[in-house]
Amino acid sequence: MLVMGRKKGESILIGDDIEITIVSLDENSVKIAINAPREVTILRKELYNKIKEENKEAVIKSSEVLKELTLKK
């Protein structure tokens, strides 16, 4: 993991086409702006983890329903 220090208004580049700029800082949070191509998905980690967990649950429920349908024949 790379750890970098940045001040308000400063940026970092990821590859050639993603730029992250520090917009504001306060005691408990950092506000960033992300400039990236539309095809790049950007999610907060907690949202990504929630979606991932919901997808796992959906697969389990779908397989349970499929088993029930198969057994009813």
UniProtKB/Swiss-Prot annotation:
Primary localization class, coarse: cytoplasm
Disulfide bonds: none
GO cellular component: cytosol
UniProt KW RNA-binding keyword: yes
Name of protein: Translational regulator CsrA
Family matches, as Pfam families: CsrA (PF02599)
Alphabetical GO biological process terms: bacterial-type flagellum organization; mRNA catabolic process; negative regulation of translational initiation; regulation of bacterial-type flagellum assembly; regulation of carbohydrate metabolic process
Originating gene: csrA
NCBIfam families xref list: csrA, PRK01712.1
Domain of life: Bacteria
Self-association state and partner proteins as the record states: Homodimer; the beta-strands of each monomer intercalate to form a hydrophobic core, while the alpha-helices form wings that extend away from the core.
Compartments, record wording: Cytoplasm
Any one Gene Ontology molecular-function term assigned to this protein's record: mRNA 5'-UTR binding
Database matches in InterPro entries: CsrA, CsrA_sf
Protein function: A translational regulator that binds mRNA to regulate translation initiation and/or mRNA stability. Usually binds in the 5'-UTR at or near the Shine-Dalgarno sequence preventing ribosome-binding, thus repressing translation. Its main target seems to be the major flagellin gene, while its function is anatagonized by FliW.
Keywords: Bacterial flagellum biogenesis, Cytoplasm, Repressor, RNA-binding, Translation regulation
Entry similarity comment: Belongs to the CsrA/RsmA family.
